[in-house]
Amino acid sequence: MELRAEEISEIIKKQINEYGKEVEVSETGTIISIGDGIARIHGLAGAMAGELLEFPGGVSGMVLNLEEDNVGAAILGEFAEIKEGDTVKRTGRITEVPVGDALVGRVVNAIGQPIDGKGPINSSTFSKVEIKAPGIVARKSVHQPMATGLKAIDSMVPIGRGQRELIIGDRQTGKTAVAVDTIINQKGGDVICIYVAIGQKRSTVAQVVSKLTEHGAMDYTIVVAATASESAPLQFIAPYTGVTMGEYFRDNKKHALIIYDDLSKQAVAYRQLSLLLRRPPGREAYPGDVFYLHSRLLERACKLSDECGAGSLTALPIIETQAGDVSAYIPTNVISITDGQIYLESDLFFSGVRPAINVGLSVSRVGGSAQTKSMKQVAGTLRLNLAQYREMAAFAQFGSDLDKATQMQLARGERLVEILKQPQYRPIPNEKQVLVIFAANNGYLDDYPVSALKKYETELYAFFDNRQADVLTELREKQAIGDDLKAKLVSALDQFKKEFTA
């Protein structure tokens, strides 16, 4: 076969022209030690704090420690296959997660990957997990109500949009129940809810998701789960992932509600990370910056000013106490960061008062200005009556012969406590709450035994729904009780009193 010089030169020219000059430069390092979700890497001299790293097998990591000769990183995923000597690549990006409407109705893990078996999430928008909270100028004071549907909270510890209200109590006192009821109560409204489960059993998270689905609440809810079986880095980052997703709605002129269940477990995960990274321990072996861990998270919940779009992000963090000790390190930290707390007591819970809210220790520092006028009108008397009842009840234990006025006050107090009880998954709209508290304050319940009050309440709602719907509509729309509306309420309640038999 004859070789022709022109053909050979043609082939060589073609090869030269098609030769790719692209050169990819990536900074890599070598793992020098790994264990418990923490890797120490040598050779990443240019790494940034919080930067995303690429480990073998497609696993991500996040830079936490920058030291002279090595970098400490938390591995965000399964690290069983990663070993010493493996190569780690820098990405040049700060850790980010997917955000947007595509996530609504889904269950995702701590880095935003779907875990509900419903296929991939088609979101092209990503946001950084760690960003600064809005400044003072970008904010507005809380002035719109965030209704929970729970009589005891909406009347005496009201929450506003953009507020941070702590739910605190021992285990098994109904903390998650309060949070889940608040999510269910947003049905038909304009609030997107995010439920972040940190360090919980998978069965518990599955139960919450099935309850939300059953009540049609998953249509406007995102669930972020970092369960007890997952590594400490994932439990540490999950709340930041959740708040990043919430901020997307806040910054797009919408309203969002986020629940962290619970931050005690996040603090424990962070303590584990810090000790493994050899950071010096402080009180209760927590690192010195555990306050900053929670403050930078909760400061991202706020009500934005009209110039910034008037969106809001409301946070309900949950803290679990040990034997009612609210003066421990983490509880006092979070109490000082938030705008109030709902304190749930195990004694009340076991005595049948559910939600088990201790009204004396619970407070809302900014929610009062967000309460509807009608609720404010009836709740002022309610709080006073309950406070007097508790004082009287304490003294009544010592004396047997009580005068008529004291007996009446004790009887009224018992009925108020009874009327504030509420079954789980049954939130009540604002106008019906106002109605029943108005009836209690004005002595309509005094003639009936405490055992008949549940029946009274159910039949009262049915009576107004069927025969006095216009009064309920007026209560809902006016959101204040004027003289004419008060007269209508009194006449309707008098009519109901004649018909009701205990």
Swiss-Prot record:
Source taxon at top rank: Bacteria
Topology of the protein relative to the lipid bilayer: Peripheral membrane protein
Residues binding ATP, per UniProt: 169-176
Keywords: ATP synthesis, ATP-binding, Cell inner membrane, Cell membrane, CF(1), Hydrogen ion transport, Ion transport, Membrane, Nucleotide-binding, Translocase, Transport
EC number: 7.1.2.2
Function summary: Produces ATP from ADP in the presence of a proton gradient across the membrane. The alpha chain is a regulatory subunit.
Protein name per its UniProtKB record: ATP synthase subunit alpha
Species of the source: Trichlorobacter lovleyi (strain ATCC BAA-1151 / DSM 17278 / SZ)
